[in-house]
Amino acid sequence: MTDTGCPAQSVDLRIYWGVAGHAAPNSHHRRGITLNRITIELETGRVSGRVASGFEPVAAAFADNFARHREVGAACSLYHRGRPVVDIWGGFADAEATRPWEQDTIALVFSAAKGPTATCIHQLVEAGRLDVDLPVAHYWPEFGCNGKEEITTRMVLSHQAGLAAVDGVLSLDQVLAWDPVVSAIAAQAPNWVPGSKHGYHARSFGWILGELIRRISGDSAGQYLNKHICAPLGLRYWVGLPPQMVSECATLLPPEGGSNAVAELLGADSLTARVMSGPNGLFGYNDMWNRADVLEAEMPSSNGVGDARSLARFYAAVIDEVDGVRLLGPAQLARACEEQVRGADAVIFHETCFGLGYALQPALAPGAGPRCFGHPGAGGALAFADPDAGIGFAYVMNAMQFNPEGDPRSRTLVKAVYDCLATA
């Protein structure tokens, strides 16, 4: 287990529940479902929120993470059949335990951003504005050189494009400015023969897809996302955090050794190290992700910022209508979730499975349904939909942990969710 530098907490068993079915001050009605207020006292701090009857074990599991898995601050949300049934948060938004994690605290979710970004692409496909089997160069002519002429959007979405590592010498300011990094990608040669294997495109995924969104729609990826997904659903989620929201973001607590562990193990010139720290070794899992300029830039695969409530609502609206909004039609969603690749990943080595932009089971969310799709984020974040169970789930946190067997915090929450669904 990774040490975050914060002591484990014990859970005070004084759990205060609202009374189901009564519109008292401690309950909240939502389209026929009563969400009961809950408070769970921790050794320091508390868990707060609202939970529908029958889903109380999710809140208990969430609180247990503070005692058993060194949670610092986090939030978890669950939609079931288009309606919220769990909305909880707790702990602290900083390492010093001076900022309680509040209802409106937002957090960096790293690669959990890939799900919303992929959904932007699928909206363009569904509208007839993008064909995933045409070369990327059809929309972005400068891209079609140095062995990339036949790379398709399908290859990019399924991590087969061979552009996992970005070549070129770039400063951080250039990367954050967008144009220099996408120009570098357009000029480079692939890392492997496109389509011959798959390997995780940790950051280039978002730059390539974001440039496609810009060239087709005229909006940056963050602008398109806000206009067509976040605003219609009232989501507090951004790629390119507005400056006035930076103060509401939880402080990321990096894991020990997170910055250079891959390079030290495999060598700085290894493909894996180049992907995970690139471009040009600029990125590590360290305090740089708390910088305002990094949060305010657009990195559509890496720096989504939002709350669990919004990500759960987002996935609920991908699979079904939520308050009159559905993000993708059934036919497009089915195509998006068709398995494209499965097997040993050329970048991160263990088995991965991808549809068109979405991570798929079994690696996505162990213990969840077989047709789940979504995306995890580095250090623990997880957001996904299960169309069979009719759920949108999200968990966000600030204390990064890397565990080769999977994050025990999200695993505990997912198990509690499905146990509740089984008895509903």
Which residue ranges define each predicted feature?
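Active-site Gly/Thr loop motif
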Residues: 250-308, 335-389, 424
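Active-site SXXK
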Residues: 62-63, 82, 105-134, 209-214, ...
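Active-site helix/loop module of the DD-peptidase/beta-lactamase fold
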Residues: 103, 108-112, 124-168, 186-187, ...
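Short, gly/Ser/Thr-rich active-site loops of penicillin-recognizing serine hydrolases
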Residues: 299, 320, 332, 337-344, ...
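Active-site-proximal alpha-helical segments within enzyme catalytic domains
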Residues: 159, 205-212, 298, 302-323, ...
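Flexible glycine/proline-enriched surface loops and loop-helix/loop-strand junctions
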Residues: 102, 188-195, 205-207, 291-300
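Short, conserved catalytic-motif segment at the N-terminal edge
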Residues: 48-110, 131
